Amino acid sequence: MGLLSIGTPLSWDESKKYNNHVRTNGITQLINIFKQHGYRENDVFLWGDEVEYMLVDFDETKKTARLSIDKDYIINDLNDPDKLLPIAEKQDVSYHPEYGRFMVEATPAKPYNGNLLSDYLYIEKNMIIRRQLCEDNLPSHIKLLTLTTFPRMGCNIFTSPPSKPDGIASQSLFLPDEIINRHARFPTLTANIRKRKGHKVAINLPIYPDKSTKLLDDTIPQNRELFDSDKEPWIGASKPGFIYMDSMGFGMGSSCLQITMQTKNISQARYLYDSLAPIAPIMLSLSAAAPIFKGFLVDQDVRWNVVSGAVDDRTFIEKGQEPYSGYHLFGGLDIDAQDKLRINNHQINQQGDLLDLYTKDGKPIQRVPQSRYDSIDNYLNDNYYDTKYFQDEYNDLNAPINEQVYQRLIDEGKLDKYMANHFAHLFIRDPLVIFSERINQDNNLENDHFENIQSTNWQTLRFKPPALYTKDTDLTTKPGWRVEFRPMEIQLTDFENAAYSSFITLLSKAILKFQPNFYIPLSKVEINMKLAHKVDSTLKDKFWFRSFELWNIDPQEFDDYGFEWFDQFINGNQQQNGHVNNNNNNDKKTKNDPIIVNGSTTTTNGTNSGSGITETNGTMLPKGCEGKTVEEINDVDDNGIDQRYTICQLINGSGEFPGFIKLVIKLIATDLVPQALNNSTISKEQLIEN
């Protein structure tokens, strides 16, 4: 999670003096990155996944399961050359710290080759090894669970050993600071978000309505006076009918599944980034796995808005809200005291933007519509790629920018206006953690100032430039232009996580091969993000997506690539070019026949019926894709460019139009399988067995 520098992190009061220094030098570093890597070509399609685990202490005698906060030494052991690192390297796995002291992040030690079918077949095995190696070197009662959220986080005793919520960093009423990673960055990050904001984060989730449910969060302490902030839930931070959470740990203590893919060049990365933007809320809904927070069943199924609220450092004025009684409108922003009268009489223009208000370093104080952790605000524009589908009207969100940064990127960096706008939007933020030893850097060789801002903008997608290297470095051996896909929730089993990881990567590779047009206005993507939070949204709701007939692909070219292709391939009825020989009279499964997956029978099909998706980890309610719409979405005449589809339709297709699955299967049939058979010693029988 972000940069883990060795050194002394500055408190907010100290670090805010260097905010402009970090932004200015970060942009210099970014300009140098573009100079070094802007014309880079022909990088291999490499990719990797990040799985986040929770260490859970099971007491069979007392029948309890609690988050383990004293076994974090395991990460050091797994990275110690004298202990477990040689074993981890030999097993091709790598381990990293996360926000929670009870958390472990694990990745493959080397990226997968996205052009090799064998690497896709290896993913689950690698994930199994990651879990086992870590678990085998912990006490037997400590288990690694891939839970999106720990259901009882914030309840009375939920940690092992027990710890009290009285920490100075978070000042939480519910979470002890002992859940936070011991590295100095993390408690400083927690405290600095609160100090910049001027009050604690306030996360309110709707309680799931039931006849026996009290629509009141009665877990909020009424008489605690340990910190001044203890009164906040009673002066406006909490809402009736909602669960109240007040700490970064409720969000950043969640686990997710993230995928990073390297493209051949920057233009391809821009097209992939834009193409995945409308898919992000679809995959958030499909992977939903978080129906319980702080011991309450909530009226939503995912973690996203919880994490968004948990790292929301915006002040009252940046959010356009009235402050709590006795609280400052500008929170912890660095402003001149003598400006108080003018500040209290600030004006806004017709768009709601603030006029003539600045911090001491000259940065305008702006309205900021979204948290640092949210969906993307701008497409990057594919007009420099082969496709050229983008139109300006697709970027229809209010996304304020840092004008000085924008102008520098245009004038000095020679970036086009869309790329400059992307980074200028990220750089409206302040750095949250600055290490005193890292204030001065070599902008030709280091990029920590850039990453300080870049890595603390946690969006559904992250456009990842390469790092800076010396002139004699062979850049082909270093990571290139990458896209990180970030919305998915972690799943309970390695099989599920491997399936989601391989699916989104195969879909991305299929997008690059077949070049569909998925652009819709980002305002529709934002509606989809809200829809994805709803209970059973995968089963019950329709999502905005580009009309099937406008994907710019020939549907007939995908006719032979439903799930039946696998049956034909396995039974020897496939022609050399990957097409299915439909004239063969051998026994065949129909589209609606069950397919055996991982030892269990799962119904999958190529139609838009409800049997293709049964349930997510966030639901156990009745099955079926009824395609119900929600009240907040009205029919809009947009000339048929965008339509509302069930997730079944988007995944499996509808009528003559292919969905995501057929794109993936055709990629496997015409690209990965022929390459595997032609370029290796493996036989078709061995490939089928694998």
Swiss-Prot record:
InterPro entries xrefs: GCS, Gln_synth/guanido_kin_cat_dom
Keywords attached to this entry: ATP-binding, Glutathione biosynthesis, Ligase, Nucleotide-binding
Record-level GO BP terms: glutathione biosynthetic process; response to cadmium ion; response to hydrogen peroxide
GO cellular component: cytoplasm
Compositionally skewed regions (Low complexity) per UniProt: 574-585, 598-619
Pathway annotation: Sulfur metabolism; glutathione biosynthesis; glutathione from L-cysteine and L-glutamate: step 1/2
Keyword Metal-binding part of the UniProt annotation: no
Reactions this protein catalyses: L-cysteine + L-glutamate + ATP = gamma-L-glutamyl-L-cysteine + ADP + phosphate + H(+)
Enzyme Commission number(s) of this protein: 6.3.2.2
Coiled-coil boundaries: none
Location of region: Disordered: 574-620
One Pfam family from the record: GCS
Full protein name: Glutamate--cysteine ligase
Provenance organism: Candida albicans
